[in-house]
From Swiss-Prot:
This is Transmembrane protein 218. May be involved in ciliary biogenesis or function. GO terms for cellular component: cilium; membrane. The gene is TMEM218. It is found in: Membrane; Cell projection, Cilium. InterPro entries: Tmem218. Its main location: membrane.
Amino acid sequence: MAGTVLGVGAGVFILALLWVAVLLLCVLLSRASGAARFSVIFLFFGAVIITSVLLLFPRAGEFPAPEVEVKIVDDFFIGRYVLLAFLSAIFLGGLFLVLIHYVLEPIYAKPLHSY
């Protein structure tokens, strides 16, 4: 089923986004004073109308079209392993240089105190 996330289509996410936005606006407008407070009613009924229109007039058919089996081919197989070999060589070379720097770090003699 194309265009689905977690087994549901885009319409469910549109309705969820609509109702989250409406409830957030209702909470914000309920704290307002004057005539703006009563706009919550119109906002709620507008969301009900939009939801009913989206539910009563679906775009897709009731039965989904049969899916065509897609054959997955890895076109970048060789390039991926060349890149892996190149990055592994860079990593090992860097590790070698760090260890050489660690082993060959000079140790300076501490000065003797002369009394």
